[in-house]
């Protein structure tokens, strides 16, 4: 079996694509995979390091405002389409799978026009424009959030699968994780992070939160500031007269490399609302306070957060409205109402899809030529 996988620009498109690629390798003993991306996206660096063959095409995204640059983009789209046709002719795939990002457009379209089975996966509650267009041509559309289905015209080819999570998320053990971070068994653990680079607004709100909950008998806090914000955050604590030596329940790190262990140790989470993060929170049944990144394309993080908040799995605080006082109140509401915390955890777990990868692979099998 031969498969082309395409998706790029950001890690949110690339890592699900790589998860699907590995899922195909597990399911089909003789699968050959080619990853098609652009040289400008993160995939040009990430994919070869993941040991998958990589080919690039020329394509870039349209500007949202009227711009002469869009004439160049349209020319590149045509050129990228011709390059995609050439790659497809040479590689001769049995299936083409797209996970979003503008690079998907030419590749999935070229495959669909040649009658090659195609599948796309949408990570967010509000689908990206590329996937909204491609859904009209793809044989299968797999989605992470039920909320996203309304934005697609053809509902007959849509399957709610969820988003594949890292295998280590499901394999990690809580007691081992607690010991690793020197956390106590008899306290609730609040995990706070703002993505790999951190989030300045969350860090600012956490200064007051640490002041409030330092030495609290019910709660311990594990907070990742992000590498870029660590020094500034530690200085903020100092300027506010906060000395961590006096608190036995606060752990501050610039970055958490073994995030799967941190998540397993947590009882509640404060974070941004990227699709991959929410997939991991729900598969573990974690209640959360979500502060969506306000500059995400098409505001998709707010849509993601709302999908959880409306089902009782999370509290949504907009970035523009976040203050230390608001965060403290949200944490207080969860701490003081154990029944609410328990119900949020149940609601979160209901949304979790630990079989997401397996379900996506089944959708791939459904559209493969019979001889496969």
From Swiss-Prot:
Topological type in the membrane: Peripheral membrane protein
Gene3D superfamilies xref list: Glycogen Phosphorylase B
GO biological process terms on file: carbohydrate metabolic process; cell division; cell wall organization; lipid glycosylation; peptidoglycan biosynthetic process; regulation of cell shape
One CC-aspect GO term: plasma membrane
Reaction it catalyzes: di-trans,octa-cis-undecaprenyl diphospho-N-acetyl-alpha-D-muramoyl-L-alanyl-D-glutamyl-meso-2,6-diaminopimeloyl-D-alanyl-D-alanine + UDP-N-acetyl-alpha-D-glucosamine = di-trans,octa-cis-undecaprenyl diphospho-[N-acetyl-alpha-D-glucosaminyl-(1->4)]-N-acetyl-alpha-D-muramoyl-L-alanyl-D-glutamyl-meso-2,6-diaminopimeloyl-D-alanyl-D-alanine + UDP + H(+)
GO molecular function: UDP-N-acetyl-D-glucosamine:N-acetylmuramoyl-L-alanyl-D-glutamyl-meso-2,6-diaminopimelyl-D-alanyl-D-alanine-diphosphoundecaprenol 4-beta-N-acetylglucosaminlytransferase activity; undecaprenyldiphospho-muramoylpentapeptide beta-N-acetylglucosaminyltransferase activity
Annotated binding of UDP-N-acetyl-alpha-D-glucosamine, by residue: 10-12, 124, 166, 196, 256, 301
Keywords on record: Cell cycle, Cell division, Cell membrane, Cell shape, Cell wall biogenesis/degradation, Glycosyltransferase, Membrane, Peptidoglycan synthesis, Transferase
EC number(s) from the headed UniProt entry: 2.4.1.227
SUPFAM superfamilies according to UniProt: UDP-Glycosyltransferase/glycogen phosphorylase
Pathway given in the UniProt record: Cell wall biogenesis; peptidoglycan biosynthesis
Compartment list: Cell membrane
InterPro entries the UniProt entry points to: GlcNAc_MurG, Glyco_trans_28_C, GlycoTrans_28_N
Protein role: Cell wall formation. Catalyzes the transfer of a GlcNAc subunit on undecaprenyl-pyrophosphoryl-MurNAc-pentapeptide (lipid intermediate I) to form undecaprenyl-pyrophosphoryl-MurNAc-(pentapeptide)GlcNAc (lipid intermediate II).
PANTHER family found in the cross-reference section: GLYCOSYLTRANSFERASE (PTHR21015:SF22), UDP-N-ACETYLGLUCOSAMINE--N-ACETYLMURAMYL-(PENTAPEPTIDE) PYROPHOSPHORYL-UNDECAPRENOL N-ACETYLGLUCOSAMINE TRANSFERASE 1 (PTHR21015)
Similarity remark: Belongs to the glycosyltransferase 28 family. MurG subfamily.
Official protein name in the record: UDP-N-acetylglucosamine--N-acetylmuramyl-(pentapeptide) pyrophosphoryl-undecaprenol N-acetylglucosamine transferase
Organism, scientific name: Desulforamulus reducens (strain ATCC BAA-1160 / DSM 100696 / MI-1)
């Amino acid at each position: 079996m031969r498969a082309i996988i395409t998706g790029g620009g950001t890690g949110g498109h690339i890592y699900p694509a790589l998860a699907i690629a590995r899922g195909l390798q597990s399911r089909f003993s003789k699968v050959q995979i080619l990853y098609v991306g652009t040289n400008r996206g993160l995939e040009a660096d990430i994919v070869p390091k993941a040991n998958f063959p990589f080919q690039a095409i020329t394509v870039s995204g349209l500007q949202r405002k009227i711009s002469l640059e869009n004439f160049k983009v349209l020319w590149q789209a045509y050129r990228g389409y011709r390059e995609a046709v050439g790659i497809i002719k040479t590689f001769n795939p049995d299936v083409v799978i797209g996970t979003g990002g503008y690079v998907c457009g030419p590749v999935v379209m070229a495959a669909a026009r040649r009658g090659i089975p195609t599948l796309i996966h949408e990570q967010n509650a509000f689908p990206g424009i590329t996937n909204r267009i491609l859904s009209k041509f793809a044989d299968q559309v797999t989605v992470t959030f039920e909320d996203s289905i309304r934005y697609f015209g053809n509902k007959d080819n849509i399957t709610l699968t969820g988003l594949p999570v890292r295998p280590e998320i499901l394999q990690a053990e809580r007691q081992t994780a607690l010991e690793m971070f020197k956390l106590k068994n008899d306290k609730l653990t609040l995990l706070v992070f703002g993505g790999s680079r951190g989030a300045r607004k969350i860090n600012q709100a956490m200064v007051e939160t640490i002041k409030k909950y330092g030495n609290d008998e019910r709660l311990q806090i594990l907070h990742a500031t992000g590498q870029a914000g660590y020094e500034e955050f530690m200085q903020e604590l100092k300027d506010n007269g906060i000395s961590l030596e006096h608190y036995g329940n606060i752990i501050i790190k610039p970055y958490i490399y073994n995030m799967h262990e941190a998540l397993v140790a947590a009882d509640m989470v404060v974070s941004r609302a990227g699709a991959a993060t929410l997939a991991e929170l729900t598969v573990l049944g974690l209640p959360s306070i979500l502060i969506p990144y306000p500059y995400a394309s098409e505001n998709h993080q707010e849509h993601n957060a709302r999908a959880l908040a409306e089902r009782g799995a999370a509290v949504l605080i907009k970035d523009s409205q976040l203050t230390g006082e608001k965060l403290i109140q949200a944490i207080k509401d969860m701490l003081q109402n154990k029944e609410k915390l328990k119900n949020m955890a149940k609601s979160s777990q209901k949304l979790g899809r630990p079989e997401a990868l397996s379900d996506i692979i089944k959708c791939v099998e459904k559209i493969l030529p019979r001889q496969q």
